[in-house]
């Protein structure tokens, strides 16, 4: 008797022979029935049969809290008929670049003297888009207290996490921490970290429109901004999204040369 893959086993049968291991010897005159089949290999009892519940046992946990829902997980949920589940809403992330020297990459005019194109925002947006987060482009703020205050206000209004680049070092025009404390009554949890690149990375929290907001100030150097976005921004966004492993996998590696650490 022919059956399809995954179909129930006919009563009395105790083995399945794959069609590749058979040879059709005789059909009915109308070609609709297979009258005689040659089995090339002797089957064993239980061959190619899976017991009921062998894929997913009744009462088993198919997804743990903190699991990321991707294509495989959606298929698994569909298999068990789970059409509605509770999920954690991902945070909206506002990106704001700072610096008098920045020119928007969308500006098609020739690069102005003394300016550089703002590559950080494009890099961070692509990274966060790739991880499935909603991102708001809040433009570029100049090194001016009022302009930075206005742009930060807009970023806080539209996002749960505000990520800035530039303005966090020790220069006269590095104003982010000053504005956060004086204008937004923010709590600075750290303003320097023992790492390089990324030493001036800043983390602050504040309340805006009765909601708690997170601010991550990254260095303006593109390499530093990229490194710190992986070490701080992504884990922060994942933790707020309910990931059980916000930091991802840790891989040990051995470098083939000596590494001279910065004494600072």
Give short role names for the model-derived ranges.
Residues 1-137:
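Short, glycine/charged-enriched hinge/interface segments at domain edges or termini
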Residues 56, 179, 183-264:
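Flexible glycine/proline-rich
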Residues 13-15, 74-75, 105-110, 148-150, ...:
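Short acidic, glycine/serine/threonine-rich loops at helix termini
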Residues 122-185:
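N-terminal small/polar loop signature for handling phosphorylated ligands or for N-terminal nucleophile
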Residues 49, 67, 114-118, 138-141, ...:
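Hydrophobic alpha-helical scaffolding
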Residues 7-8, 100-101, 167-173, 220:
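Short glycine-rich anion-binding loops that position phosphate/pyrophosphate groups of nucleotides
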Residues 46, 69, 140-148, 195-200:
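Short acidic loop-to-helix transition motifs that present clustered carboxylates
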């Amino acid at each position: 008797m022919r059956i399809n893959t995954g179909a129930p086993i006919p009563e009395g049968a105790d083995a399945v022979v794959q069609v590749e291991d058979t040879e059709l010897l005789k059909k009915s005159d109308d070609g609709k029935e297979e009258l005689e089949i040659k089995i090339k290999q002797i089957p064993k009892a239980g061959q190619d049969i899976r017991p009921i519940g062998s894929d997913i046992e009744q009462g088993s946990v198919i997804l743990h809290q903190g699991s990321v829902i991707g294509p495989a997980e959606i298929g698994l949920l569909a298999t068990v008929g789970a059409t509605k589940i509770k999920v954690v809403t991902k945070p909206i992330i506002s990106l704001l670049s700072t610096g008098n020297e920045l020119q928007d990459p969308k500006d098609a005019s020739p690069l102005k003297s003394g300016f550089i194109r703002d590559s950080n925002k494009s890099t961070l947006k692509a990274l966060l888009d790739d991880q499935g987060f909603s991102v708001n482009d809040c433009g570029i703020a100049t090194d001016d207290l009022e302009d930075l205050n206005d742009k930060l206000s807009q970023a806080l209004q539209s996002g749960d996490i505000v990520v800035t680049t530039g303005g966090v070092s020790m220069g006269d025009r590095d104003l982010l921490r000053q504005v956060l404390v004086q204008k937004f009554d923010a709590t600075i949890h750290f303003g320097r970290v023992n790492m390089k690149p990324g030493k001036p990375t800043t983390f602050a929290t504040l309340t805006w429109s009765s909601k708690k907001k997170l601010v991550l100030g990254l260095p303006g150097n593109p390499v530093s901004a990229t490194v710190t976005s992986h070490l701080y921004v992504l884990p922060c966004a994942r933790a707020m999204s309910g990931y059980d492993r916000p930091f991802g996998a840790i891989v040990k590696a051995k470098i083939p040369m000596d590494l001279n650490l910065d004494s600072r």
